[in-house]
């Protein structure tokens, strides 16, 4: 994983989150109690921190929602057993829907993927709606083994994802996209 690979994500980099071995805080949200093991670090996410994450020394996560409630990426966190099949189905669906820029990253857990759909400066409400729509269309074609971020099921500060480990596949622009 290089710095250039991570630039594909356009992640919020004015702060980051470090995973702790213990619970950092407890929060009640929509009738549920959530326990957070990530501690917010109000320093810019730099290459040194990213390298420590890639080496496995620390676990770093990034926020998906910036301080102005805008979202750069809609992310599908796939936790199934067949990433190749999932990516193929998702790729076809995203092309059909007119999304031409998306990147799939491998996570620390083998077989799990983070599929970043690059939307750019999307309002939070629009991101929620697009995420639900994409998830519903995917669920019509295969068993649901993923979560979509950002999600309304979690507080804003819990809409974070671990930094990816390696690029699985990427797609940048295509002449056959119907929405060009």
Regions flagged by a language model, labelled:
Residues 20-21, 102, 139:
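Residue-level signal for secondary-structure boundary elements
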